[in-house]
């Protein structure tokens, strides 16, 4: 029973701390370190981490700017209901960056 208590209450706070640490690193301009903090959380399905990685690829922060990868990370996060990522996906559909062509129908859905 105590084991479940630990899993339910402490594991999410550890992940939240990793995301906040990554944001602090991004604000300090340490993008490579931020990516190293974010990648494990994103691979385990954390929508905030996925959205931040999308931002890094979209803006070329610590990685080579890549609209296709940015769109993929935004899309993963948006499928989990992340509002910032949903906005990013809509923008990519509207402008058509990272896609074969703009898709205004999907952009405004």
Labelled PLM ranges:
Residues 1-8:
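Sec-dependent signal peptide recognition
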Residues 12-17:
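N-terminal signal peptide c-region/cleavage motif recognized by signal peptidases
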Residues 43-47, 59-61, 66, 79-83, ...:
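Short helix-capping/linker turns of helical repeat alpha-solenoids
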Residues 102-109:
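TPR/TPR-like (Sel1-like) alpha-helical repeat modules
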Residues 19-25, 41, 52-59, 63, ...:
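Hydrophobic face of amphipathic alpha-helices that form TPR/SEL1-like repeat modules
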